[in-house]
């Protein structure tokens, strides 16, 4: 399963929630339904995977970390274990359909070789309404030994009936000093760590990817170039066209963060960490040009654009909507 680094690299902000879950499991009090929430890149999958490895490890006991050497640990590390099923969309951005949930329900109902059978749904907010209804029946009457772990960065998209059947385990972003201390193990350059922290919007695993994976760094640089273009009245249209080369799930949250930075600059004269990633003169001109009211309107629109990111809205229409909003939002 993904995000399963060696335990020496297990994110420290996940230790406490992991330990609490393991203690409950050892005491026979682990809920049959868990909803792990938190921002994308905070470590939900890492928490889930380490929890399952600890519970299935043939050597670990109490709150000891998984050994990483037994057959169960090796199987989970390789992404295959007979008692664990990972349910994901067939393609990123697609829905999880009802037939997939029915197969998962059948998996949970089969007797296995151990006491634990786990279904991990990643991300749970990809369930369509029929799939969610099929899952609800299992959450209401789970088979003996079954544990369902739902992960979601957008839990509000889940039906209330699903959320109410799960115990919520929320993972907040760690404080910036703790995050940057952890990131320092991957890049000793403090300025690079600060840039990755800002670019990731404080999401730890996303920040690590920016530091260690050239493709993620290139994606951030591409997004920054697009956003910088939106700040320039003469470059809005080319920047909007360039959005087609970017991923909405990374660009739109950064667009929202940029507008928050601009509002902060307009109201306090201060530049926050994300805003400091852009030319100061361009930010200042953008703030003067749109004024507090125009910035507030753009920020409200940005929330809507981000909500639309998981919908089948034509990217061309979104691009045009953003361009028109930036061109027409001027007002003091």
Language-model features: where?
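Conserved adenine-binding aromatic site and its adjacent loop/helix in ATP-hydrolyzing domains
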Residues: 106, 137, 160, 164
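Charged, glycine-rich active-site and insertion segments that engage polyanionic ligands
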Residues: 1-54, 72-75, 144-147, 153-332
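Alpha-helix capping at helix-to-loop junctions
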Residues: 110-114, 129, 141-144, 168, ...
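Clamp-loader machinery-focused feature within the broader ASCE/P-loop NTPase space
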Residues: 1-130
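Conserved catalytic/switch belt of AAA+ P-loop NTPases
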Residues: 133-150
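Short, surface-exposed loop and linker segments with low hydrophobicity and enrichment for Pro/Ser/Thr
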Residues: 127, 136-140, 246-249
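Conserved amphipathic alpha-helical interaction elements at protein-protein interfaces in regulatory
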Residues: 57, 110, 140-141, 329
């Amino acid at each position: 399963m993904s995000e399963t680094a060696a335990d020496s690299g297990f994110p420290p902000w996940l230790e406490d929630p992991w330990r609490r879950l393991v203690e409950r499991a050892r005491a026979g009090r682990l809920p049959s339904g868990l909803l792990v929430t938190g921002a994308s890149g905070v470590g939900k999958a890492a928490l889930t995977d380490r929890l399952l490895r600890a519970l299935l490890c043939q050597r670990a006991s109490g709150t000891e970390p998984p050994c990483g050497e037994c057959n169960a640990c090796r199987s989970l590390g390789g992404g295959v274990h007979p008692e664990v099923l990972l349910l994901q969309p067939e393609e990123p951005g697609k829905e999880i359909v009802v037939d997939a949930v029915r197969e998962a329900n059948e998996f949970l109902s089969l007797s296995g070789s151990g006491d634990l059978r786990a279904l991990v749904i990643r991300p749970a907010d990809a369930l369509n309404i029929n799939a969610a209804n099929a899952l609800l029946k299992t959450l209401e009457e789970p088979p003996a030994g079954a544990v369902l772990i739902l992960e979601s960065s957008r839990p509000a998209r889940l039906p209330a009936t699903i959320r109410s059947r799960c115990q919520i385990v929320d993972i907040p972003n760690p404080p910036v000093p703790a995050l940057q201390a952890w990131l320092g193990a991957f890049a000793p350059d403090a300025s690079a760590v600060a840039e990755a922290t800002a670019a990731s919007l404080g999401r730890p695993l996303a920040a690590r990817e920016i530091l260690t994976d050239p493709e993620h760094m290139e994606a951030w640089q591409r997004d920054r170039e697009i956003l910088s273009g939106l700040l320039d009245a003469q470059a809005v249209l080319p920047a909007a066209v360039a959005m087609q080369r970017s991923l909405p799930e990374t660009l739109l949250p950064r667009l929202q963060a940029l507008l928050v930075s601009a509002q902060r600059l307009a109201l306090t004269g201060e530049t926050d960490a994300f805003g400091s990633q852009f030319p100061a003169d361009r930010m200042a001109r953008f703030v003067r040009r749109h004024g507090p009211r125009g910035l507030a309107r753009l920020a409200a629109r940005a929330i809507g654009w981000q909500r639309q990111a998981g919908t089948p809205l034509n990217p061309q229409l979104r691009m045009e909507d953003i361009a028109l909003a930036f061109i027409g939002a001027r007002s003091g």
